[in-house]
């Protein structure tokens, strides 16, 4: 699946351009685990790739300086490194999200560039699944569970809105359900 980095519409792997706005569709991040590991070796140890999307890939890593704390490393696709608009969007995502302090919003630890210049965001690693995955796996969710999920999403969005931050990409893929009482 290829995702338009502007409007987030998804297309089959053989599509090259977004039908809505004509944006070229990037493939999954071309950053390999070994390349990423060598570029961040002093700071992080890459454990595994968690997933990929239109703007890049996310890896489970351990932050070496802090006792191998697990983190999710979001890495911008190399295909977008020469596009100032995407570099700015990636940076804005990190700085905006880092301003939000709320239990229903992932915590950003830092953002930066690997030794080869690949931008990354290190954030809280959450165990669980996206709402999209839960819906595909379980089908329709009970009304009470939906109400609780929506309540938590609304509280997180409210915290963002109080800071003047608008999400702009709220969808089941971007709602993460953690395990247990988290």
Please place each PLM-identified region on the residue numbering.
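Conserved ATP-binding/catalytic core of the eukaryotic-like protein kinase fold
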Residues: 2-23, 28-182
């Amino acid at each position: 699946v290829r995702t338009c980095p502007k409007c987030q519409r998804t297309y089959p792997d053989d599509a090259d351009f977004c039908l809505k706005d004509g944006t070229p569709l990037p493939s999954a991040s071309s950053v390999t685990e070994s390349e990423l590991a060598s570029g961040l070796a002093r700071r992080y140890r890459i454990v595994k790739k968690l997933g990929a999307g239109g703007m890049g890939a996310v890896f489970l890593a351990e932050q070496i300086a802090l006792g191998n704390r697990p983190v999710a490393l979001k890495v911008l696709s190399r295909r977008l490194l020469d596009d100032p608009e995407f570099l700015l969007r990636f940076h804005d995502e990190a700085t905006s999200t880092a301003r939000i302090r709320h239990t229903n919003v992932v915590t950003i630890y830092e953002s930066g560039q690997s030794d080869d210049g690949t931008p990354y965001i290190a954030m809280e690693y959450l165990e669980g699944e996206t709402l999209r995955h839960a819906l595909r796996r379980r089908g329709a969710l009970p009304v009470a569970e939906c109400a609780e999920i929506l309540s938590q999403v609304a509280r997180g969005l409210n915290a963002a809105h109080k800071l003047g931050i608008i999400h702009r990409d709220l969808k089941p893929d971007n709602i993460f359900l953690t395990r247990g009482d988290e």
